[in-house]
Regions:
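A structural signal for short hydrophobic beta-strand segments in well-ordered beta-sheet cores
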Residues: 154-157
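Hydrophobic, small-residue-rich alpha-helical packing segments that form membrane-like cores
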Residues: 147-148, 163
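Flexible, small-/acidic-enriched active-site or ligand-binding loops
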Residues: 151, 200-218
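A short, Trp-centered hydrophobic/proline-enriched beta-strand micro-motif
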Residues: 132-140
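A short core secondary-structure module
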Residues: 161-162, 166-207
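Internal helix-loop-helix
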Residues: 63-132, 174-180
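Buried hydrophobic positions in well-ordered alpha/beta secondary-structure cores of metabolic enzymes
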Residues: 25, 36, 87, 118, ...
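Intrinsic disorder at enzyme termini
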Residues: 1-24
């Protein structure tokens, strides 16, 4: 009896996910799958070997609605989280570096702006991030404490007209090519605050880490 039930399992879809999806979710999944197989897969080996990131990938993802896909409004498609998970799985199927590029842009850059930013900030950044015209990164992890937010050394000191931020971040995906930086720091009271920085601001640098062992295409 046990042998018969074992043989009846569909190993291509053991959790029967396919029959649980809606038509819209399948369409999103198939779109991401086609993009991954036709656009990303042919060049991933060379990108991995050379540690190169093709900036056009962001624009191609944006044109298909794959960036900031769960956000409603601001030129974003507003799909459900199941669809977002399916997108991530299809991009991850090709390379985790490409998935990292997409998920950092969507979940760690666009979502914080959408959830906590002012209306002016949302209108300024989200449409351009959704198309891939702008590239973003998420600056939490630091050399000394890793991703332990409670141990942040980076400080945001109140000054006339705003804040002066000092500190260092490490292992920040997308940072060497980013236009928008979501940076987390402790303020004068020791509370963690998020800041939006832009490429070219005085004192801001994002050198590329050479010789990575993984995520080399991102």
């Amino acid at each position: 009896m046990a042998g018969n039930s074992w043989k009846s399992i569909n190993w291509k879809d053991p959790f029967l996910l396919e029959q649980q999806l809606t038509d819209d979710q399948r369409l999103v999944r198939d779109t991401a799958h086609q993009f991954g197989q036709e656009k990303l897969l042919p060049g991933v080996r060379e990108a991995f070997r050379k540690e190169e990131t093709d900036l056009n990938i962001f624009k191609e993802m944006g044109s298909l609605g794959l960036l900031g896909s769960t956000i409603h409004g601001y030129d974003c498609p507003g799909v459900d989280y199941m669809s977002y998970g399916l997108i991530a799985r299809e991009i991850e199927r090709v390379d985790s570096g490409y998935r990292s590029m997409m998920s950092v842009q969507s979940s760690l850059v666009m979502y914080p702006i959408y959830a906590f930013g002012s209306e002016q900030q949302k209108e300024r950044y989200l449409p351009a991030l959704s198309t891939g015209e702008l590239i973003g990164c998420f600056g939490l992890t630091e050399p000394d404490y890793g991703s332990d937010a409670g141990g942040l050394i980076t400080r945001a000191k109140s000054v006339k007209g705003g804040y002066s931020i000092s500190g260092a971040k490490m292992w920040i995906s997308n940072s060497p090519i980013a236009d928008v930086f979501i940076v987390w720091a402790k303020n004068d009271e020791g509370k963690i605050k998020g800041f939006i920085l832009e490429k070219g601001m005085e004192g801001l640098s994002a050198p590329k880490i050479e010789g990575k062992l993984a995520l080399r295409a991102s």
